[in-house]
Amino acid sequence: MALFFTSDTHFGHAGARSLYRRPFASVAAMDAAMRARWNTTVSAADEVWHLGDFALGLGVVARAALLEGLHGRKHLVSGNNDPPDTLALAGWSSVQPYAEVEADGRGAVLCHYAFRTWRNMGRGWLNLHGHSHGRLKPLPRQADVGVDSWDFRPVTLQQIAARRRIRAAPSRLPRISTPGGIG
């Protein structure tokens, strides 16, 4: 089982092509390409954390069918464009506004929005987010996992680390000694 992250798919969103300069001839072409890339990247046994803004402009039945057709066990970290009926779709394994995961020797905090500081930041944990569509300069150990930054497909922690050159932090913070006894 592999662990993947994505955000800001905006399936069905007519304005996404122009707002985010997506290179597709139509919304239908955009949706088809993202579905195909998701399903060639993710297997049925994999796990995917979607960090918000799943779909806009699709009815609830279409959203449910779309979610069901995407490979993997899917979790939603809600975004500003996820209405209550998206949060209630049966295809989500879990739904929450914030999550923390540990995998491949790394910890990560997950939210639709980027943080300036986050839990365990000093211990090397990552902040994975969406919302900014690749337009926000990241802090160290921070990454926008939105499809606009990752060829319209989910990504792994290894791919994120390779692009960002993030090194695993030591498991223990060094002890700092100063004259006068602090530390």
Annotated model-derived regions:
Residues 10, 54-55, 81-83, 114-115, ...:
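Catalytic metal-binding/acid-base residues of hydrolase active sites
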